């Protein structure tokens, strides 16, 4: 698919971001994801326990956060070159990331995201979906392993 089509179907600016979901996850899936991003990407993680920024996510702190019902604030930014993927550690039942579509300027940017999504899908052995913000039912892309499906409007 060409960049112009991708821009108009996925990365258009409507005032909202795009969400990335891996649904029906558990703590093991999250640990797999944390190990993947810690090994492959530049990270900026806010450790809510120490109130410090760190370059690696400490999964034991995330598990503690979940046990304390979210009393610690914790987010992470994963950098795919110039693209920032934000991660929210709400609970272990789904992995949720979000992206700002305005950061996507080229087919290369799209391909960087696709590479990340494929790695996540393969590592967790689960489907990854990209949706409109807060709309998991409105799927823009599905990734299963190396298979990428763009849902045309």
Q: What feature does the model see in each segment?
A:
Residues 4-7, 60-62, 70-72, 112-115, ...:
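Short secondary-structure boundary micro-motifs
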Residues 1-65:
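Long, contiguous N-terminal structural blocks used for assembly/anchoring
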Residues 5-19, 79-93, 118, 122:
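Short, surface-exposed loop and linker segments with low hydrophobicity and enrichment for Pro/Ser/Thr
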Residues 1, 102, 107-153:
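Acidic, proline/glycine-rich low-complexity IDRs
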Residues 26-28, 82-84, 93, 103-105, ...:
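Residues that cap or initiate secondary-structure elements
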Residues 43-99:
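Short, intrinsically disordered low-complexity segments
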Residues 15-24, 93-103:
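Short, hydrophobic/proline-enriched secondary-structure or compact coil segments at domain edges
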Residues 34-49, 100-116:
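Short, positively charged, low-complexity/disordered linker segments
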